[in-house]
Amino acid sequence: MRLLIFLGLLWSLVATLLGSKWPEPVFGRLVSPGFPEKYADHQDRSWTLTAPPGYRLRLYFTHFDLELSYRCEYDFVKLSSGTKVLATLCGQESTDTEQAPGNDTFYSLGPSLKVTFHSDYSNEKPFTGFEAFYAAEDVDECRVSLGDSVPCDHYCHNYLGGYYCSCRAGYVLHQNKHTCSALCSGQVFTGRSGYLSSPEYPQPYPKLSSCTYSIRLEDGFSVILDFVESFDVETHPEAQCPYDSLKIQTDKGEHGPFCGKTLPPRIETDSHKVTITFATDESGNHTGWKIHYTSTARPCPDPTAPPNGSISPVQAIYVLKDRFSVFCKTGFELLQGSVPLKSFTAVCQKDGSWDRPMPECSIIDCGPPDDLPNGHVDYITGPEVTTYKAVIQYSCEETFYTMSSNGKYVCEADGFWTSSKGEKLPPVCEPVCGLSTHTIGGRIVGGQPAKPGDFPWQVLLLGQTTAAAGALIHDNWVLTAAHAVYEKRMAASSLNIRMGILKRLSPHYTQAWPEEIFIHEGYTHGAGFDNDIALIKLKNKVTINGSIMPVCLPRKEAASLMRTDFTGTVAGWGLTQKGLLARNLMFVDIPIADHQKCTAVYEKLYPGVRVSANMLCAGLETGGKDSCRGDSGGALVFLDNETQRWFVGGIVSWGSINCGAADQYGVYTKVINYIPWIENIISNF
């Protein structure tokens, strides 16, 4: 199907080129008079054969028998096309001076062929004459012999009865239908330098072309033209460039025309606009020209880099539109006056001045370091020195605060004080936890008064009609029992928090106010004491000192320090053996009780009450040592022998109504089970 479509299109093209009607066939047979018998004397016959335009005639002989004579003077067949004789034939075979057709084929030079037969007055022998056949055939005008001129500049396309020409990209067929003229007008060059040349340079340039080249630079530049390599433009010895010519036009005047074989001299145009025209005629075979154009402008002063800086690029001369940038050494910053710059680039103007003044490279100044709460900063490099590579040392208030890093910071090139780990924020002085002057031995119910420094984490929680306790675990977080603050969870500000006291009613204390109370989501008020744990976030951080200090949270290894019969300490202002709230902070050292035994005791005392795995029991089978009402939320603490710090292992939760009774233990929330919950609340709030 595709082939049929193609053939249809081809037929349409040929029909368009030749007209709507295909030429009638031209062919036939020619014979001598009387053939195949002998021809008579005194015979003169001629045939004029004609083919359609674009065709030629082909003729060959199948029989040829004529009288042989010197130069075929007697009998002959003459073939001629136009004014040219193609051949004069006689005899049967060719000799040195005579030609017989043999197997040769003869072609007309155009669409016409004349065949002439002549016999003289006598023949010594009977000759039978000739038989010839002819036909018209298409002429391939695109096929040329060596030395003949080509019909087309670029591409020649033959068809039946004629041909047509086409051109390569960048050329257009001239109206003469043979010459390809270059499309070389409207070329614009805007670079400060470059090359331009005649089409096809260094090959011969095309004929009948008119080229225009425009150089357009910014005002302030001046174009310089240099002819390079070779110059070959058709000329005439008696006239100035009458055939092909090159002209150069500026707003200051015209240069040229140029032709011949001598390179024209340099042309300093003193203009930023140049137009070059190149015109060619239909003759000649010349290679053309090539121009290297450059530009110049009024130079700007050589820039000098500021101290501690450099410029780029470095050039021998800077002219219009040239630019340079300034870069400072590491530790220095660009300043224009007092204004910091992210970057700096200056551009040369047409009047020979830079568009911006040179900046400075000023040493980076990180400024005074941030104050360190509960600590201080020392200048190591020198008093108040805060510039690049200066060193400062942060330190925490000894004994009560510590930091995880070494506290050394350096002023870096980005303008920030930076630690050896790349930290930009100052260190944090974290409170030291678990320091106490307490030694094991004493009791609450059956206990004794605490001394200053024994339980610096102890917190007194006062409601309008209630009192409870808590333990400071950070400078703004208090750990307590959920049941002790449950009623205050929606009105945290009504809770009165006091620290740094031993006497419950002492007027000398540190006041703290809650910001928010967090009850464990697994705690259900009035339905047992599982998950009896809560956190109180303080509005402000408290200052850590000998009277106020957090207790540590248990390490992973702490479970081994809270086994049965291991001793812990609990302190509080709860009921004493006399049934009154203690005026002084009391404490007692009590052992951990066996969990199964404790569970069995409370199943017997209070059927349905469960001692869960989130609880631990403490006390003596014989009684006498226990926490009691008013101690709720206080910390049951243990000494970590490895760190020599006290940690909270339990929170006073619940127990028998009869505090300190035999076989009735105090029950505490097991803190180690809630470390992930505690850390999550503190880190997110």
UniProtKB/Swiss-Prot annotation:
Gene3D superfamilies noted in UniProt: Complement Module, domain 1, Laminin, Spermadhesin, CUB domain, Trypsin-like serine proteases
Post-translational modification, as annotated: The iron and 2-oxoglutarate dependent 3-hydroxylation of aspartate and asparagine is (R) stereospecific within EGF domains.
Catalytic residue list: 483 (charge relay system), 532 (charge relay system), 632 (charge relay system)
An annotated GO cellular component: extracellular region
Single GO molecular function: calcium ion binding
Disulphide-bridged cysteine pairs: 72-90, 142-156, 152-165, 167-180, 184-211, 241-259, 300-348, 328-361, 366-411, 396-429, 433-552, 598-617, 628-659
One Pfam family per UniProt: Trypsin
Tissue: Plasma.
Residue runs in coiled coils: none
EC number from the UniProt entry: 3.4.21.104
Keywords recorded for this protein, A-Z: Autocatalytic cleavage, Calcium, Complement pathway, Disulfide bond, EGF-like domain, Glycoprotein, Hydrolase, Hydroxylation, Immunity, Innate immunity, Metal-binding, Protease, Repeat, Secreted, Serine protease, Signal, Sushi
Residues bearing glycans: 103, 285, 308, 545, 641
Domain EGF-like: 138-181
Stated role: Serum protease that plays an important role in the activation of the complement system via mannose-binding lectin. After activation by auto-catalytic cleavage it cleaves C2 and C4, leading to their activation and to the formation of C3 convertase.
Similarity field: Belongs to the peptidase S1 family.
Entry protein name: Mannan-binding lectin serine protease 2
Organism the protein comes from: Mus musculus
